[in-house]
From Swiss-Prot:
Protein's organism: Paenibacillus borealis
Subcellular location, record wording: Cytoplasm
Keywords carried by this UniProt record: Cytoplasm, Glycosidase, Hydrolase
Name of the protein described by the UniProt record: Beta-glucuronidase
Organism placement in taxonomy: Bacteria, Bacillati, Bacillota, Bacilli, Bacillales
Reactions it catalyzes: a beta-D-glucuronoside + H2O = D-glucuronate + an alcohol
């Protein structure tokens, strides 16, 4: 699916803004067919945004079930006779869409876009109405999974229920990304796939163009950043040779622009689309992660799409601030933990040269013990696996052309120690390699190395571990021994490079004590430093992603003090002591650390 943008032939109408909104706590709206008429008794709701923190109503913040959105729009008369599409960037986690009372789309999965052809139902030159019902319920067939617990005892009101989930971030919901209309002609470009290679001083850009109909002529043109022509081609697939190519490099991004033109049988321009292309290669070789044949060391974070008021709603000001902080702290990468982020953010990563590990929203596939089964007929089952395949396929289809994305992560902290995990993740690994043979794949591990049964299917070992926090809390003197023991065993067992994708400690900004104690800024800084002492001794360690970039919202609980405080920045993006330590460490490290 191509990201909607204005081109020589395409036109965009952004429906972002204030929508009419109504919660449906009794889930009556579908049965009563609220979509057949304008919604009644609504409140204003911004789109894009999570709805949870917009009002002062705790019931809406913690709502379980359907909510309804409505907006009106006018299709320009100039669009008459054209193909009209409605694109929804994100709807967490299930959605049904109606235009003028007619169902045009339904979608499962909260972090990737979907679209609907509304040509037959939208009327140019008059007001039209779009209605979207969004449901936030998580179960074992969603990504991430969850379950509804209904209480049946005298201590709770009849029918009282809660949404349980097994991941550590708040279940924000709503229309998190923009909603857009766009038009094309009846003959249009459906998809573009780009591959790149480097041969000596030349860059090689492979392209494959999928069109709506076989007739029509395809022409492509690659321009450099000065707008000068670098290469041209004809046909729906081919290869462009770029002499003296400028490569896309970490923190030194160079982007070409590919223009694709589709001509009709009369030689007239029917459709045009352009996208940015970064020429680069990615390869895992032994214990080295290579970008353009040069060793790369991951310095950065696990992040979240999370900020005050808007929750997981797209906010370009927050995104730009975050990228400025990444550069300030001398980071070069992040993981889209634990779901696909907005494509607007990936475009920013492309421009800024920030390296990205793209992750599927498969988080919460464990009960954090070695006894309780996850892969059972009534939990993670064949329906779950089918949805996992669908989401993985959609993620690769959306992000395959982003040079910043160098690796796919197929899950976070899954129960990879269970026998049933072997066929489950073998199939997913096969799907990822078939859809994108150019990128390495990984899975982020929770079990210890002698327990994992699936690491052999992946190219890089990614490990999350919280020594002296969840294990042996407060015992900083154990960190180096335990980290070195575990990472060495991962390498000994599987012979693959290792990235520490999560490590850290909660720190409440302004809490201080010396000697360090838990929850102080000093403790967070000291714990990270002791991890780093180990990384610097191990040749097979190729990266360090601190958990987390910034504090973020979670469900309420006795282990969370108004959210997770493991960020080295506060939720308002102010640095803690650990941020300045990391800035110094990563700045002195250069592109690749000298191992001791």
């Amino acid at each position: 699916m191509l990201f909607p943008k204005d081109t020589l032939t395409r036109e965009i109408k952004d429906l972002s803004g204030i929508w009419r909104f109504k919660a449906d706590p009794d889930n009556r709206g579908r049965e009563e067919k609220w979509h057949h008429q304008p919604l009644q008794d609504t409140i204003p709701m911004p789109v894009p945004a999570s709805y949870n923190d917009i009002t002062q109503d705790a019931a809406l913040r913690d709502h379980i079930g359907d909510v309804w959105y409505e907006q009106t729009f006018i299709v320009p008369r100039s669009w008459s006779g054209d193909r009209m599409m409605l694109w929804i960037g994100s709807a967490c986690h299930h959605a049904v869409v109606w235009v003028n009372g007619v169902e045009v789309a339904s979608h499962k999965g909260g972090f990737l876009p979907f679209e609907a052809d509304i040509t037959r139902v939208a009327v140019p030159g008059r007001e039209n109405r779009v209605t979207i019902v969004v449901n936030n319920v998580l179960n074992w067939q969603t990504l991430p999974p969850g379950r509804i617990k209904t209480f049946d005892d005298e201590k709770h009101p009849e029918g009282y229920r809660v949404q349980e989930y097994f991941h550590d971030f708040f279940n924000y919901a709503g229309l998190h990304r923009p909603v857009k209309l766009y038009r094309t002609s009846g003959l249009f470009i459906q998809d573009i796939t780009i591959t790149t290679d480097v041969q000596g001083e030349s860059g090689v850009v492979g392209y494959s163009i999928e069109c709506s109909q076989p007739e029509g002529e395809v022409r492509v043109k690659l321009l450099d950043e000065d707008g000068k022509e670098a290469a041209t081609g004809k046909g729906s697939s081919g290869t462009l040779q770029v002499e003296n190519a400028r490569l896309w490099k970490p923190l030194q991004a160079y982007l070409y622009t590919l223009h694709v033109e589709l001509l009709d049988s009369y030689g007239q321009l029917a459709d045009h689309y352009q996208l940015q292309v970064g020429i680069r290669t990615v390869k895992v070789e032994g214990t080295r992660f290579l970008i353009n044949g040069e060793r790369f060391y991951f310095k950065g974070f696990g992040k979240h799409e999370d900020s005050d008021i808007r929750g997981k709603g797209l906010d370009q000001a927050v995104n730009v601030k975050d990228f400025n902080l990444l550069k300030w702290i001398n980071a070069n990468s992040f993981r889209t933990s634990h779901y696909p982020y907005a494509e607007e953010l990936l475009e920013l990563a492309d421009r800024e040269g920030i390296v990205v590990i793209g992750e599927v929203p498969a988080v919460g596939f464990t009960f954090f013990n070695y006894n309780d089964k996850v892969y059972t007929p009534d939990q993670a089952n064949e329906e779950t696996l089918a949805h996992h395949h669908d989401v993985l396929s959609d993620l690769i289809a959306r992000d395959k052309n982003h040079p910043s994305v160098v690796m796919w992560s197929l899950a976070n902290e899954a129960a990879t120690f269970q026998d049933e995990a072997v066929p489950y993740f073998r199939q997913l690994a096969d799907t990822a390699r078939r859809l994108d043979p150019q990128r390495p794949i990984t899975i982020v591990q929770w079990p210890l190395p002698d327990k994992c049964k699936v690491a052999q299917f992946f190219d890089v070992i990614c490990v999350n571990r919280y020594y002296s926090w969840y294990q042996d809390p407060g015992a900083l003197e154990l960190v180096e021994h335990q980290v070195e023991w575990e990472l060495t065993n991962w390498y000994r067992n599987f012979g693959k490079p290792v990235i520490m994708t999560e490590y850290g400690a909660d720190a409440i900004a302004g809490f201080h004590q010396d000697p360090p104690v838990m929850f102080t800024e000093e403790y967070q800084e000291e714990l990270l430093t002791r991890y780093h002492n180990v990384f610097d001794r191990l040749d097979f360690v190729i990266g360090e992603h601190v958990w987390a970039f910034a504090d973020f919202a979670t469900k309420q609980g006795i282990t969370r003090i108004n959210g997770n405080k493991k960020g080295v920045f506060t939720r308002q993006r102010q640095p803690k002591a650990a941020a300045r330590m990391l800035r110094s460490r990563w700045g002195e490290m250069g592109e690749y650390p000298e191992k001791l």
